[in-house]
């Protein structure tokens, strides 16, 4: 039986690309035509985020690493990734693929030793990003804590980044208040889950 390269296996399928394409920014009408296919660049971004490799180690088949990074950084500043996520989440809810029984939990991402030297005066910061870049020193060293609200069907409804030393309990209400799932047509977005599950780390809240 032939094997499939792991990286290729996780690339977007034709059906997934057809679903994603209408949500992307329209192509530029001026300037030189795009040399590298947008689909390859998007797959390059997804590969890097999935495996956590340095940008320079993104496989060449996706395009030049700097071009993949440029797409990621540009769309990050423009809020494109957030809009894509919100649109896909709304579509999943309208199709009945969200149960609204959620779990709240957190995880630590350890930072590289050089991360403590990140600039605090960058003008290319994403809207709302704090000066500390959600980087703090806990017992295990420098890191970032991700607080997430996960639907029973494994869909991420909201997440919040804090410095690694921050506790779980104080962030429970803030991350739950970040839930926002748009509805098709008019009407307010849905923000309240039916049931919330959490471990003992949140019992004091």
Regions found by a protein language model. Give the residues of each.
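Short alpha-helical elements
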Residues: 1-205
């Amino acid at each position: 039986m032939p094997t499939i390269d792991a990286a290729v296996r996780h690339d977007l399928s034709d059906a997934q690309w057809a679903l994603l394409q209408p949500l992307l920014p329209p192509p530029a009408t001026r300037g030189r035509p795009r040399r590298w296919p947008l689909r390859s660049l998007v797959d390059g971004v997804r590969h890097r985020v999935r495996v956590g490799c340095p940008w320079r180690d993104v496989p060449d088949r996706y395009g030049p690493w700097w071009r993949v990074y440029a797409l990621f950084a540009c769309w990050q500043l423009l809020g494109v990734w957030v809009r894509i996520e919100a649109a896909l989440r709304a579509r999943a809810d309208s199709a009945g693929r969200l149960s609204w029984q959620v779990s709240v939990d957190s995880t630590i991402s350890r930072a590289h030793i050089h991360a403590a030297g990140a600039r605090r005066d960058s003008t290319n910061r994403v809207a709302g990003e704090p000066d500390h870049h959600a980087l703090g020193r806990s017992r295990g060293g420098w890191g970032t804590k991700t607080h997430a609200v996960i639907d029973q069907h494994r869909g991420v409804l909201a997440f919040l980044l804090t410095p690694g030393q921050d506790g779980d309990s104080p962030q429970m209400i803030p991350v739950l208040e970040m839930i926002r799932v748009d509805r098709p047509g008019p009407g307010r977005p849905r923000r309240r889950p039916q049931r919330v599950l959490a471990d003992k780390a949140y019992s004091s809240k």
